[in-house]
Amino acid sequence: MSRNYLYLITLIFIITSCGGGGGGGGGSSEPPVAAPTVSISLSSSSIVLGESVTINWSSSNATGCTATGSWSGSKATSGTETLTPSGVGFFNYGISCSGSGGSRSSSVGLEVYRQTDGVSVDGYIRGAEIFIDKNNNFTVDVGDENSTTSDNDGKFTIKYDDGNLISLGGIDLDTGNPLDNFLINQNLSGYSEFKVITPVTSVASFLNDSTSINNVLGIDSSIDVFTFDPVANKGDGGINDYLYEKGNQLTILAFSLQNIINNINVTTETTQDYFKSIAEEIDLEYETTSQKVDIETSNFVLNVLNNIT
């Protein structure tokens, strides 16, 4: 009996030493819960106002999602929706998904912008560089400013921005003459679907009050010179032809002065300084007389030339 008892004690000792009595080797822990993954994308990163964009999102290890940023509400763990933003600007669309393993978020950006159509006019000017100058240096800053080229009818479509809408160079369709360094512009004071760039809008941009352009040049008050196409509407023998003729007179004056000064100084200056000088002289004469200014008189031309030199 004592020998059997000794065997039993020895067996218990061996079992205990091997961990058989309930040590750590016999148990198991549960695996960690996987965290969610989330992805979101747009069919386009930029659209014109009024267009739509498709948004797609998906997730894994998630039980529910919530839209954040420029959209809102509870969302399925994956899906597709069509969005039509109601305004312009930069929008951020986010999605946050959660599950037993926590939550994850992702987002994507969208630019919504307007476009404006327009025409470059002396006669119509084809092949002109059209751009929106945002820093008033009268040159296009590639990559920072919107630009395009006028087509064979002088027309263009450009991404709208605040600034100075400029037409530079090109070919005059009425005469076939190249317009080297011929720069005309319109200061953009607000969005409209159609803009014209003409010698008249160029002078207006340099007046003390651009809205006085009709009064100072005697243009009929019913004409909006910033949206009215003087070429398309000429031929009535009346107010439309008068507007067209004023544009031609301003072109001849500014272009002639530019060529004279460039030849004297051996430079390649564009016409904006000459339109500016014309506007300054118009302001001076109108402030004195409160009458429309005759830009064809020799005194007017000499005063403009003196302002430049």
Describe the predicted segments one by one.
Residues G25-A34, E111-T309:
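Feature for extracytoplasmic/surface-facing segments of secreted or surface-associated proteins
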Residues P32-L42:
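Proline-enriched interdomain boundary motifs that mark the N-terminal boundary
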Residues K75-N92:
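Solvent-exposed segments in extracellular or luminal domains encompassing
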Residues R104-V112:
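C-terminal edge beta-strand
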Residues I15-S17:
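C-terminal motif of bacterial Sec signal peptides marking the signal peptidase cleavage site
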Residues V53, G89-Y93, N164-I166:
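Exposed beta-strand face motif in extracellular beta-rich ectodomains
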Residues S45-E51:
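Short, solvent-exposed loop/linker segments at the N-terminal edge
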